């Protein structure tokens, strides 16, 4: 970066070598240029400086991980400090990298003595010396902690504390108002990171609540019968590689949703395999809806063929059919209703019986169907 001889410009460059000094979270974002100008020679030079100001752009620096990024937040090496002192203020007796010295070195660098390494060091040091640096660092670490396992969260907190201590050891910090552009930048990105953490936490919390709800549903289902607790034969047969005692011990195990996929699957299988096995056995015992046993259906068809002219069994006949087939009366009623709709068309005489509403009982009992059905006088074994 170059600057005019009659102005002082301090663009905050966040790209460059990270081996000589601290880094900050803002290196991963595009940031506004912080520039101060001094007017000395009129409108032409101001216009030239403004064009130069608009041409600056900050480069994103991609870190391999947040831990590597935080571990890079260490004070500059003694060699780097000596390099800055020898280039910018060799006669200064103040402590290295004090806030006033940073400002003085920044002015010298803007006058033509800067280098990529020195400018990067100065920008990093200036940000770390800002009063809001610890707040910014904490907001960044909180974003990284969302959804992280407990051990990773502990390492992040430890690294954050080390980085804050490293920043404090660099010397006295600046005060608000000395650099309004930097103040505005730090405030804006702190607020942005806080909002980002809130947006990250919202779906994570919803997922945790959903998992807890599902776990409660599993427990309510499994506790409905003694066999589903892992004590029954179904659970023992289901777990050939384990024992029922092991299943009981796993009932109070906490399933960590942050575990790896394979580990999580293993925990769920160990905890709920007995429950699921028992439920499966109970479901298999239930008959499929809409399909009657073959033998019972054949007996109903035999009765249907013998009474095809008028396939309306009486209540006594239904009881006899229920006893012989093992079905309940509701199943028998439904079967005859469906069978008549699909396979029965009354004859002309029967149509007259159905349509004659004036003397239905007399016609039914006297002329057409006067003889009682055989089923009224025989046992269910003869159907």
Swiss-Prot record:
Highest taxon, organism lineage: Eukaryota
InterPro entries xrefs: ELK_dom, HD, Homeobox_CS, Homeodomain-like_sf, KN_HD, KNOX1, KNOX2, TALE_homeobox
Keyword terms of this UniProt record: Developmental protein, DNA-binding, Homeobox, Nucleus
CDD domains reported in the protein's UniProt record: homeodomain
A GO term from the CC aspect: microtubule cytoskeleton
Example of a GO MF term: protein homodimerization activity
Pfam families documented for this protein: ELK, Homeobox_KN, KNOX1, KNOX2
Keyword hit for DNA-binding: yes
GO process terms (BP): carpel development; floral meristem determinacy; regulation of meristem structural organization
Span of domain ELK: 263-283
Chain spans, region Disordered: 37-58
Location in the cell: Nucleus
DNA-binding residue intervals: 284-347
SMART domains listed in its UniProt record: ELK, HOX, KNOX1, KNOX2
Major location (coarse): nucleus
PANTHER family: HOMEOBOX PROTEIN TRANSCRIPTION FACTORS (PTHR11850)
Task of the protein: Required for shoot apical meristem formation during embryogenesis. Probably binds to the DNA sequence 5'-TGAC-3'.
Family, as annotated: Belongs to the TALE/KNOX homeobox family.
Protein name: Homeobox protein SHOOT MERISTEMLESS
Protein source organism: Brassica oleracea
């Amino acid at each position: 970066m170059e600057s005019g001889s009659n102005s002082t410009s301090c663009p905050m460059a966040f790209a460059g070598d990270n081996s000589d000094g601290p880094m900050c979270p803002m290196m991963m974002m595009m940031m506004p240029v912080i520039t101060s100008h001094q007017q000395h020679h009129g409108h032409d030079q101001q216009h030239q400086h403004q064009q130069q100001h608009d041409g600056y752009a900050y480069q994103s620096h991609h870190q391999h991980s947040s831990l590597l990024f935080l571990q890079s937040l260490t004070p500059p090496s003694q060699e780097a400090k000596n390099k800055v002192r020898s280039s910018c203020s060799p006669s200064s007796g103040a402590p290295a990298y004090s806030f006033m010295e940073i400002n003085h070195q920044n002015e010298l660098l803007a006058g033509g003595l800067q280098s990529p390494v020195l400018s990067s060091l100065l920008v990093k040091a200036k940000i770390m010396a800002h009063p809001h640096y610890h707040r910014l660092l904490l907001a960044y670490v909180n974003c990284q902690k969302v959804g992280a396992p407990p051990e990773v969260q502990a390492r992040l907190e430890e690294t954050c504390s080390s980085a804050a201590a490293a920043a404090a050891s660099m010397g006295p910090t600046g005060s608000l108002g000395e650099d309004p552009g930097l103040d505005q930048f730090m405030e804006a990105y702190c607020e942005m990171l806080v909002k980002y953490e809130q947006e990250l936490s919202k779906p994570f919390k919803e997922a945790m609540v959903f998992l807890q709800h599902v776990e409660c549903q599993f427990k309510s289902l499994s506790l409905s019968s003694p066999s589903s607790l892992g004590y029954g034969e179904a659970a023992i047969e289901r777990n050939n590689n384990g024992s029922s005692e092991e299943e009981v011990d796993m009932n109070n195990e906490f399933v960590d949703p942050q575990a790896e996929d394979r580990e999580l699957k293993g925990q769920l299988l160990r905890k709920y395999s007995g429950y699921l096995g028992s439920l499966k056995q109970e479901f298999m015992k239930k008959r499929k809806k809409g399909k009657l046993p073959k033998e019972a259906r054949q007996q109903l068809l035999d009765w249907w063929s013998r009474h095809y002219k008028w396939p309306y069994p009486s209540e006594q006949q239904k009881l006899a059919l229920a006893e012989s087939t093992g079905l309940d009366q509701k199943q028998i009623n439904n079967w005859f209703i469906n069978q008549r709709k699909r396979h029965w068309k009354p004859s002309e005489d029967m149509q007259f019986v159905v349509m004659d509403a004036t003397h239905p009982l007399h016609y039914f009992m006297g002329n057409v169907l006067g003889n009682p059905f055989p089923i009224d006088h025989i046992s269910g074994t003869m159907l």
